[in-house]
Amino acid sequence: MTRIRVAIRVPVGRPLRDIAAFAARCEDAGFDGVGIHDHPSSGRDAYLALALAAQATRHLRLFPATSSPVVRHPLVLASLANSLQEIAPGRTCLTVAPGFISTRSIGQPRAGLKFMRDAIGDLRHLLAGETVGFGPTATRLRNRTAAPPVYLLAAGPRMIELAGEVADGAFLMVGLDPASIRAARRHLEIGATRAGRTLADIPVVFVVTLGLGPNDTVGAQWVRSWFQPGQPFLAYPSVANLRWLREAGFELDEAHDPTAIPEDRAHQIADAFGLFGSPERCADRLLQAREESGVDDVFLFPAHDLAGGYAMPEAEVDAFERIIRSRLGV
């Protein structure tokens, strides 16, 4: 059976050198990777944090989680990705997404499909050393290293199809229910077919929400909570979450009141949505997802609301080192 590779989201919630030390702590705890969120409004740059983390670690996979080509021009992103690959050869990838907090902070909407298609194409061409036209200007990336792969973080069906068509790989936030994963893979395959590829050509990392607690009631608590006023927890970071919950048999309106979800129903939704409860239960649920759906590469996304978005995942790293790691056989 394939070993499950596990990375974890780390926010820029501390001074940069402390974040690098925390990345080293994650490596020692047994994680395969760390993704540092790219929110320029935080006042701390994700790529500087990743560069320092690269110097503090030996084999940890490092990537932004995630960068928006709306906020950072594709040439800037390509240069940053190339630089990070130079510092940590073979340990990096570039992950891009339409944007949420980062685009909102500059007063711009999320990127649409065409914008992301063009941006990913430009990024891959630049990283391959090819010339790309920006308006009347032809530009080429100099001082290249080996090209890092470009992953698209996709939540909705059409964005998942785009990942299958134009990206080197996909980060999918579709929950853990087998029906949801099957549906998402069908869309990934649609995109892959357009480009003459198969699913086997596209590495997939599943973005999995993790909410630790003494028992599984914590899952229902998160499901019945708000991310911020007017935005249910289940609709963060994308309302597309509700699309995949429908595949799992749960009908929720985009503007639903989470507090009105019956508690027993909330427990079921939590089990389809992510990993909730004790470390032992979370590990067993992840093993179940591997057995049912072949989930073998995950990016843990610690559950949080807007106010808690910069809290460091201390408890999650501790639980992984003490319990989850050995239970997964990592």
Region spans (language model):
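N-terminal beta1-alpha1-beta2 module of alpha/beta enzyme domains
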Residues: M1-A65, P148
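Active-site mouth loops of central-metabolism enzymes
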Residues: I4-R17, S67-P74, R144-A155, L210-G213, ...
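Hydrophobic faces of well-ordered beta-strands that scaffold small-molecule active sites
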Residues: I4-V10, V34-I36, R61-A65, T92-V96, ...
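Short, acidic/polar
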Residues: R14-C26, L77-L80, A154-E165, P279-A289
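Acidic (Asp/Glu)-rich catalytic clusters
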Residues: A23-D28, L50-R61, A81-T92, G164-E165, ...
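Alpha-helix-loop-beta-strand connector modules within alpha/beta enzyme cores
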Residues: Y47-S67, V71, A119, L126, ...
